[in-house]
Curated annotation (Swiss-Prot):
Pathway(s) annotated for this protein in UniProt: Siderophore biosynthesis; enterobactin biosynthesis
PANTHER family named in the record: 1,4-DIHYDROXY-2-NAPHTHOYL-COA THIOESTERASE 1 (PTHR43240), PROOFREADING THIOESTERASE ENTH (PTHR43240:SF9)
The protein's name in its UniProt record: Proofreading thioesterase EntH
Swiss-Prot/TrEMBL keywords: Cytoplasm, Hydrolase
Organism: Salmonella typhimurium (strain LT2 / SGSC1412 / ATCC 700720)
Family: Belongs to the thioesterase PaaI family.
Active-site residue numbers: E63
Subcellular localization(s) per the UniProt record: Cytoplasm
Disulphides: none
Subunit structure: Homotetramer. Dimer of dimers. Interacts specifically with the aryl carrier protein (ArCP) domain of EntB.
Purpose of the protein: Required for optimal enterobactin synthesis. Acts as a proofreading enzyme that prevents EntB misacylation by hydrolyzing the thioester bound existing between EntB and wrongly charged molecules.
GO molecular function, one term: 1,4-dihydroxy-2-naphthoyl-CoA thioesterase activity
BP-aspect Gene Ontology terms: enterobactin biosynthetic process
Amino acid sequence: MIWKRHLTLDELNATSQNTLVAHLGIVYTRLGDDVLEAEMPVDARTHQPFGLLHGGASAALAETLGSMAGYLMTRDGQCVVGTELNATHHRAISQGKVRGVCLPLHLGRQNQSWEITLFDEQGRRCCTCRLGTAVMG
């Protein structure tokens, strides 16, 4: 297991109360040895005006996953902040849920890189993201 902080899924989800994460309906669903996953509904909260998943909502899910994964890699007295987010949209989604899978690309002392892939309910890739974070403290 790569994580330096040991939280349960319930504890991870409790951190989202009264935040954008909760408003968008994002829920952490899996914390594996080197992977963090979450789901987000594709509904009125996350749609753009034409009834499709908003690219900004996809980016919010990706940044949420990468930032929390980054936090799990810090020690007491440290935190992470996002420095760069890139998202490539591959497929539109109009309903259901989108699942995000976050894996490390680079875990340095001062910076981290995370790959977050979003999938529709049929398991098709709909967005590929990369988040860079800086370790503070």
